């Protein structure tokens, strides 16, 4: 019998499997538009840190997509809460708060990995070769952990789908464009760099891009991202405990 976090994770996988063809199409459109519009139309002849712009862009898209798709698990949780009342069933089930959070977080991380795989496949079609080493995937997984955990926590706090949309607008969208995904932060004023340095996506972009280029990765990036992942996961467990009571 499937029980604990595996039951939660398996349920989300079944939902994802049923929607996978449409999801693949949806996950492909935005990266393809970014690659064509920014990588070719605007990035021709542009060199950043010794790489073409499209080479610089793809690791940024990986960081951004792993963030957005991991965070999207929050919408799935809210649909289950508001329409199917799945959370009420969980409240009555002998499943610990940590197991529930772990199952949902793993589902969000799985979505993120699938979306990242599509971006990398598109990059190969555009002739971009990156070093997909262990550090690269560790950065993707940590980034996904942070935002999937945050999504679970916020999904327990919001009261409606409009509240969830506001979270996307105020949290995810700014980080998607200001976290070093589309341009190097060194081009911004120092005070803005200081503000952006507290964002987990900034450190995720640094890890993923440096790993993809075979460059050294600052230990600060690892510590901040891992710390954010731990804090967000514990926060999610506490919020679920409060919602369950």
Model-derived features with residue positions:
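Hydrophobic transmembrane alpha-helices and immediately adjacent juxtamembrane helices
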Residues: 1-127, 131-134, 138-206, 210-245
